[in-house]
Regions:
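A beta-rich soluble binding module of mature secreted/lumenal proteins
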Residues: 12-161
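Bacterial N-terminal signal peptides
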Residues: 1-9
Length: 161
């Protein structure tokens, strides 16, 4: 009975997602500037427009991360660091000292122009592009992939660029 209550209380609402990463990734090609096209809402980027993420590869496969955006015309930025894991396409990212979060590149086009990123949680999803606007066919393909993976794409916030 206790087990059943635990499942009802904690397990039934868990969204099943496929957050598997790309099979290979060249971090030198992934590095650089990315526009955040869409994202799930989360506290640390709430109401931000013109969002970008810049990744700079350092020694020992460490990556410096700079996230920028604007809120009510005011420039906001957050610097962090990332480190690679044994799983291709998966990073550990920190913006707050020793506390790391999961970051997964789940879809990446062959030319490293567009990406679908997430984490181990169904609460994080983002669409990145090297350009501020996605081609409609590319957008629909990424949305279809996210939906196939179990994400509710109706929750995406489309970022003003």
């Amino acid at each position: 009975m206790l087990m059943a209550l635990c499942l009802v209380a904690f397990g039934c609402n868990a969204q099943k997602i496929d957050n598997s990463t790309v099979k290979t990734i060249d971090l030198n090609r992934y590095a650089g500037e990315w526009y955040e096209i869409a994202r799930f809402d989360h506290r640390f980027e709430r109401d931000l427009d013109y969002c970008k993420a810049t990744y700079v590869l350092c020694c020992d496969n460490r990556i410096n991360v700079l996230n920028t955006g604007q809120k009510n015309g005011q420039f906001k930025s957050s610097s962090g660091k990332a480190k690679t894991t044994k799983e291709p396409g998966r990073l550990r990212v920190s913006f707050f000292g020793p506390f790391y979060s999961d970051y997964r590149v789940m879809m990446l086009d062959p030319d490293y122009q567009d990406a679908l990123v997430g984490s181990k949680s169904a609460k994080y999803l983002g669409i990145l592009s090297r350009t501020p606007k996605l081609d409609e066919n590319v957008k629909q393909a990424i949305l279809a992939e996210a939906t196939r993976r179990g994400y509710d794409v109706s929750k995406l916030i489309w970022v003003k660029q």
